[in-house]
């Protein structure tokens, strides 16, 4: 099935409970780089957070902790750690409990980063499904972010997710729909 990228400046809103098909969601979601001041509605935010809660984690440890930041004071603190909020009125800081993660056989990897990534991915796709624009932000020092926000010492920050509605005229970057051929990224053994 061919996936058609919709030529829009922002994601279609979820009006009347009509949802996009999953392939449309993944094809049309893009990293928004400038937001209007319109706040994300509570019911849409709840749907986004619920998608993260339903994400699978190693051994179902559910070591994630998502911080919702909306106040001007806390957004200003985030702005001291990363320049990549792009004016989003809501951000999610996705962290995980480093004392409650699964250590894989061999002891070289733990599940916290992977599990938090799965959770964040569920939430970012749920945002697109709700018609909410987003940006995955990892341009910051995780330790400084945790310290700035006063997070518990056992929690490690994975990423920041900008949420909101694109400012007028803002859309995907020119390279958004450029993808390598499947043959370049997949090998059958």
Which residues are covered by each model-predicted region?
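Acidic, surface-exposed loops and disordered segments
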Residues: 2-189
């Amino acid at each position: 099935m061919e996936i058609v990228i919709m030529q829009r400046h922002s994601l279609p809103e979820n009006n009347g409970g009509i949802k996009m098909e999953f392939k449309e969601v993944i094809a049309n979601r893009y990293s928004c780089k400038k937001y209007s001041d319109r706040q994300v509605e509570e019911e849409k935010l709840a749907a986004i957070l619920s998608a993260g809660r339903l994400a699978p984690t190693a051994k179902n440890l559910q070591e994630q902790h998502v911080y919702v930041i909306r106040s001007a004071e806390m957004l200003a603190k985030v702005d001291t750690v990363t320049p990549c909020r792009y004016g989003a009125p809501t951000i999610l800081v996705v962290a995980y409990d480093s004392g409650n993660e699964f250590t894989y056989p061999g002891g070289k990897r733990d599940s916290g980063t992977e599990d938090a990534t799965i959770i964040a991915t569920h939430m970012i796709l749920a945002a697109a499904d709700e018609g909410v624009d987003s940006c995955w932000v990892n341009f910051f020092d995780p330790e400084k972010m945790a310290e700035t926000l006063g997070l518990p010492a056992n929690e490690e920050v994975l990423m920041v997710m900008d949420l909101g509605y694109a400012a007028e005229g803002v859309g995907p970057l020119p390279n958004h729909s450029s993808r390598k051929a499947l043959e370049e990224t997949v090998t059958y053994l």
